[in-house]
Amino acid sequence: MDNIIQQITDWLKGVLVSGIMNNLTDTFSSVNDQVGQIATDVGQTPSSFLPAVFNMVKNLSESVIMPIAGIILTFIACYELIQLIISYNNLASFETWFIFKWIFKTFVAVELITNTFNITMAVFDVSQSVVMQAGGIIQGSTAINASTLETMQSTLEAMELGSLLSIFLQSFIVQFLMYVLSAIIFVIINGRMVEIYLMVSLAPIPFAIFGNKEQSMMGQNYLRSLFALGFQGFLIMVCVGIYAVLIQSVAFSTDIIASLWKVMGFSILLAFTLFKTGAVAKSVLHAH
């Protein structure tokens, strides 16, 4: 009878160990893949991330928004010319240089909205270069590798049935939460790029207002917002680097449950800090 009970116990332990290892493998693979994809996605420019979407946004901006920007620019140019005339006592004290000043300002404004996409893409080219350099410096691996899982399996095989059942239930819960976390990370990273596309689609309007003294803050704030979105990628890379250091500090061979929940906590911390990167970048660059 004792032999039969022992065989049943060993069989249950084998099933639980196998189930735990499957849960852990799926859990860490999901997070490893998602975190590993962050550096790849963040390091791309809007034109290379989703070329089809970028071309659509560019066509919409040039065919729909650009004419509106042209109307706004025409209104501003006429308004500034009137203001210049009034400021010189209705041409009573006429000086020709202010006409050349007006022509120069209008020419610069026209060039700005004509080269809107070149300017906006230059911002993201600069930020991409910064992100790629940061990726070269941040060498820490965020992955939980196969040897770590093998060590965990050896530890699990030496445990009692009750402990294995507890770990199995907790690993199932952590697996579900990790999938949710991976989805959140995916939304944050891809949401940033969607926000970039939305900002770029309206680019001609703030560029049309850039040269006007009274309304120039709109154009300046827009440019700061573009740089904030670009350098948000750098802050995301910093978060991933911190996550890599924290993950490597976890020892899975001693207390598996504590280590498992610690990884869970670090992953939640990563998602939270990724949420904050946009606000931090805008705060530093004083963008609204």
List the predicted regions and their residue ranges:
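Gly/Ser-rich, low-complexity
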Residues: 1-72, 87-97, 107-177, 216-221, ...
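Structural signal for the C-terminal ends of transmembrane alpha-helices
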Residues: 81-88, 210-215
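Elongated alpha-helical scaffolds
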Residues: 102-105
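Extended serine/threonine-enriched, polar tracts that run as long, contiguous segments within proteins
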Residues: 182-189, 193-196, 200-239
